[in-house]
Amino acid sequence: MSSVSSDIDGPPETKRFRIDVDTQVGIDTPSVSTNCAPPVAGEASQDGQSPAAPSSASYRSSNSSVISSSESPIKDEDVDVHDGQDDTEDIAMDVSGSTGSIVNNSEIFEMLNKTFGGVFNCDLEGIMRPSALMHPSSPPTPIQSAGIPGALAVAQSPAAQLFSGDDWSWHRNPAASIRSGGTNKQTPVWKYFVYNKTENLSRCIVGDCTYMLKGPHTSTLACHLKKHTREYSEFQKLKTEYSRTKLDQQPKIPDGAPHPLTLQTQNTPRQTGSPASTCNTNSNTSSSVSSGSGIGSGSGSTMDLSMKKPKKEPSSAKLNEMLFNGLRQATNNSNGSPPTTPHAPQLPNIPSFVTNMMLQMNPLHMMLAQSLPGATPPTPTSSNAGLNALQQAGLTLAANGQIIQSKKWRNDDKKQKELCTKFALALATSHVDFEVVQNPLWKEVFEMAQPKFSIPTESQYEHIVNSTSHKLIQSLKSQLSASKKLNLLLDITKITADISRVTVSVALTGGAGNSYETQVILLAFRNINGNQSEDLTAVFEKVLQDYNISPSSINRVICSGLNELAEPAELPKQMDSFSSRLANCFKSWLETSPTVEVLKKNVYAMLVSYLTVPAAIQLASQMLKAKFEVPLTEPFHVIVEHLVAHRDIYQMNMEGITLISEREWNKVTGIHHLMNIFKPFMTYSTDMTTVDTVIPTIVQIQNVLEKDIYHLGDIGSDLLTSLKQTVAPIMNPEHENFDSTYIQATALNPQLAVTLTSDQMTTAKSLIETEISRRTKKMRKAQSDKKLAMGVDSLLANVMRKNDGGSDGGCETALAIYGDLFQSITGNSSESKENIVNQYFDEISSTTSVESMFMLRTFGNPMQAPLSYWKSCSSRCSELSDLATELLSIPIFTLTAERVLSFSPDSSSLNTNLILTNLDSTDQFEKQVLLRFNRQIVSKLFN
């Protein structure tokens, strides 16, 4: 009892320390009521640690020591260090033992949150907080604050005021803080150096030393101080005293009370400072804590202080160990096992998503899955989600189950995203299932090509394809809405007797300067439910609705393959493609010409004879060094190409083989020559061919046939007759089905207009004048229907009445005042539109080339590209320029299914197997085809 009474009679005598001030001011420093001395800073510095030494302001705001009012000085040697350290260790062990599970789990979640970048970003206080019924809440004792012993006094001393703001010589007091840059453990070095801020130089003031350093770098100055042995030894002692870290005060925990960590969110608002452990140098501190009564429990005269060591980043092995310990602790609590400490609070159930994530991170913990509260066995989907979370954080699982740094790119890395996009699009546009990626050989290929690349999952693959397809559709809609007139291309391809495919595309004209070009964009590749014209019309209207295309914005609908339907279809502004007309002309000639029919019989007889002689097939294979096949079932134009390519084989004279004559070989060669002439105009090509080139092409073909008719004989004459019948609606204005589009387009091309005859030129001029007059009247009517604001219409009516009254002077005065208003109604120019058309035809129909070069031109340079030429003339006559642009942008062919489905530009055969295998997924197949054909637009979406 005597010892207890001596403890409660009053606080022990406080020990004080002082700091020697080297300036001319002597001030007794206030004392701190504490018996807990910190560890020697010299030992900390020798161990490689860096004690914190913040500025005086931050130091004062966070310090929790109590300043005594005693003024009696005492020596520094009176401070008892060893007793305080022993008691500190005892109490720290006691507190940590009672709250070990709480701190352990809080550290686990804190490490997980740092490691996985916010994956475990949850309310840890809610998880770690025990029930309020388990422990009565007791508010913590208010914490008092005080300044730094000596530092505040020196900073406010008259001696410090004698120095200017840019003079750091007053910092030679080791306890004072640097006014302009904060403090660190090297601050006492300013006792031996002086810094001038104006010169940015630090000078040594030890003896006669002339050392100077640019800048106030304390570490470099401390290295120089090693040359002065006595001063350096003194500097080490000063640094040891100055390197004391901040001490946070924490009230004592009564018996049965919860740890302050669990009460932080219940009783006090959240603070930026972290809670600290407690210590006391009194010999009976342990007993007072356990009994709940002591010196510090009822009053704030003495506070418990401890050293807070900086946290170190946990290693992967430590992280796995802590995860395992946390799961084991939770398992013990759920099974009813006795806690390791007698008064440890019970840990509540961990949320299931946190437990499942912890299980997915390390396979070694999965054996605890059945006993974890709220946990469910991990599925392959959840395991993949956990691995994806690791990959997103730049981590991975090692073979032993440890979480290590990943060598692969993060999921949000730019290169990883680019390669994932290209890989997904390449896989989708090749019409290959994602299951092919499960082949280990593919993983080996990617691992060798780019080890840092991670193959995307199936969900990521689908997301990339769907999002890119959506972006493509939106981009196409914006391009279509920006165009005034659209030329739609429609082609019908018959796959089987009951399966047909329609290909809808659009030809857009764009460019600048002299580089105008027409681009073909695929819009749809869809199935026709029947072979009636209504089925085609329904599909066409659905495409227009999907892309928000108004019928008024359609210039022409170029069609091909309509003969595949049972009934002829009628679409708005429909126009048959010239390429399909020319192809039908050539094919009908091969099927109906009597001369070609006789040649066919002889050629088929020769091919059959080769099939009956195996030795001939074997010899042909030896000559080709490959298997030789006879194309007996192919169309005749394919057979002609085959015969010309292997003429030496079919001229072998062997027993049992029927050969054709030399004259017939000449006919075969002539047919092949004609095929080469027609072929560029019958198939799709990347070089856009427009309708203004049709008439010059027809004239050229006719000239070739008339020139070579002597060598071709009846074959040439039959083809010439068939060609004239086919092109009659284009060339002859007197034909009942005459299409004036070709003549007008050719006349509006200043380079090809000379190929027209005088009759054709006159017809084209008359048609163009009529169209321009119609458009001008339509524009004036639209302008007159608009009511002018602010009474301008009545003002204009007065002007027009003065003009009709015959008063020339009044009319001239009115027009002089309201000239712009009058021209806005009557026309932008006084020059007649018909006169502009006549002037254009006069310029392009000059007699000689020399005259054409030196004559004064008002429309531009005729050597420009046609679209560029009319773009430059739009200010002269907008109606004529718009008409020319519309006609000169109409293509002569359509985009066929063969071209859409071919992977190589040289391939011309239809891949029917690709269509038949995707009959059940037509929408997905169309999406893939659009991405592949419009790959140039897709590439611009990611630039």
UniProtKB/Swiss-Prot annotation:
Q: Which UniProt keywords apply?
A: Cytoplasm, Developmental protein, Metal-binding, Nucleus, Zinc, Zinc-finger
Q: Which GO terms describe its molecular function?
A: protein dimerization activity; zinc ion binding
Q: Which domain of life is it from?
A: Eukaryota
Low complexity composition bias: residue spans: 50-72, 277-292
GO cellular component, alphabetical, reads: cytoplasm; nucleus
Instruction: Please provide the Gene Ontology terms (biological process) for this protein.
Output: negative regulation of distal tip cell migration
**One Pfam family linked to the record:** Dimer_Tnp_hAT
Instruction: Please list the tissues where expression of this protein has been recorded.
Output: Expressed in distal tip cells and in germline cells.
Is Cytoplasm tagged as a keyword? yes
Question: Which SUPFAM superfamilies is this protein grouped with?
Answer: Ribonuclease H-like
Q: Where in the cell is it found?
A: Nucleus; Cytoplasm
Zinc finger spans (BED-type) are 184-235
* Observed effect of gene inactivation: Defective cessation of distal tip cell migration from the dorsal muscle towards the mid-body during gonadal development. RNAi-mediated knockdown of cacn-1 in mig-39 null animals results in a strong overshoot phenotype in which anterior and posterior distal tip cells. RNAi-mediated knockdown of Rac GTPase, Rac-2, in double mig-39 and either ced-10 or mig-2 (which are also Rac GTPases) null animals, suppresses the overshoot phenotype in mig-39 null animals.
Point to the regions of Basic and acidic residues compositional bias.
12-21, 73-85
Composition bias of kind Polar residues appears in 262-276, 328-338
Instruction: Briefly state the protein's biological role.
Output: Regulates the timing and orientation of distal tip cell migration during gonadal development. May act in parallel to cacn-1 and Rac GTPases to control the anterior and posterior migration of distal tip cells.
Could you identify this protein by its name?
Answer: Zinc finger BED domain-containing protein 39
* Origin species: Caenorhabditis elegans
Taxonomic placement = Eukaryota, Metazoa, Ecdysozoa, Nematoda, Chromadorea
